[in-house]
Amino acid sequence: MANKTVLFNKHLESNAKMVDFHGWDMPLNYGSQIEEHHAVRQDAGMFDVSHMTVVDVTGTDACAFLRKLLANDVAKLKVPGKALYGGMLDDNAGIIDDLITYYLTDTFYRVVVNSATREKDLAWIAKQSQGFDVTVTERPELAMIAVQGPNAKAKAAAVFSADQNAAIEGMKPFFGKQAGSLFIATTGYTGEVGYEIIVPETEAEALWQALLDQGVKPCGLGARDTLRLEAGMNLYGLDMDETINPLAANMGWTIAWEPTDRDFIGRQALEALRDAGTDKLVGLVMEEKGVLRHDMPVFFTDAAGVEQQGVITSGTFSPTLGYSIAMARVPNSIGDTAEVEMRKKRVAVRVVAPNFVRNGKQAF
């Protein structure tokens, strides 16, 4: 039996096409993936992300534990509510998961992990927490709704109470704050402004309906994927996994190398990979007809005249740009052009930074 989120019936009311997503019954779309995509780029859309797992880490050693567990450094978080993104690595520097961590107090951090990796993550976190004075608490009674797009904040403000709006007024990107029963965060997976709202399951249906009443368009996994790919955001299991290190997944910026005496899990392996050199994740753009897809091979000739090969990790048609885009893992020596093999022939592509659309506009 697939898991169902607390919003399952609301999806059916909006005529969602439901699919299995890592053991969860989730909406693929509500009729038109393209319309849902454009709603987020041009107005406001919302996603049920209640399949994500909220984990609270509390105790006197919470900071020390997370500084060991994560490649990014939570000690950088000084202002309550500030969040950071980063990888949780194994001893070989493989990515167990990518996650967001919120600093709430010196003894209270909130971590949001992916649904596909939940059991693995929880087991790893529990194992690594031994010897630290911390309590790790999964919060299954909490649902999550992401409201994204240029008009998302205004439409959400019409739903929040006066006290909630006052609490989050002027909140910068990548912050989260408890406001009444809602934990409201200025994070997202679309490249647009908006909120990710953690809400008690008992209130989730009412919040979803209130947002619907404000004209926020429900959006499914299909649009979520094209939006995140346009924004150059990784999807765990496609763009990286335990066989990939963060340097090869465009996550180098999330590694806190300083201070050098912080011995986070995977550090030694990662330093060796850094010194030896790794593949890298790049963006590909193909302006002629056709769609770049996961697993298609990528070819280029390096400066020494040697043919090199990589692979597409994620590819799609970009509704915002009107042509196909992809992320590909390739040898470091790639230039600004390459070829992709599709339908038994090679097609020329441009190589760009893996960030295609930001705030509705072309980003490369």
Swiss-Prot record:
GO molecular function, one term: transaminase activity
UniProt keyword terms in alphabetical order: Aminotransferase, Transferase
GO cellular component, one term: glycine cleavage complex
Keyword flag Transferase: yes
InterPro entries: GCS_T, GCS_T_bac, GCST_C, GCV_T_N, GcvT/YgfZ/DmdA, GcvT/YgfZ_C, TrmE/GcvT_dom1
A GO biological-process term: glycine decarboxylation via glycine cleavage system
Top-rank lineage group of the source organism: Bacteria
Keyword Nucleotidyltransferase on entry: no
Reactions this protein catalyses: N(6)-[(R)-S(8)-aminomethyldihydrolipoyl]-L-lysyl-[protein] + (6S)-5,6,7,8-tetrahydrofolate = N(6)-[(R)-dihydrolipoyl]-L-lysyl-[protein] + (6R)-5,10-methylene-5,6,7,8-tetrahydrofolate + NH4(+)
Protein EC: 2.1.2.10
Pfam families listed in its UniProt record: GCV_T, GCV_T_C
Function: The glycine cleavage system catalyzes the degradation of glycine.
Family according to the record: Belongs to the GcvT family.
Entry-linked NCBIfam families: gcvT (TIGR00528), PRK00389.1 (NF001567)
Oligomeric and partner information: The glycine cleavage system is composed of four proteins: P, T, L and H.
Protein name stated in the entry: Aminomethyltransferase
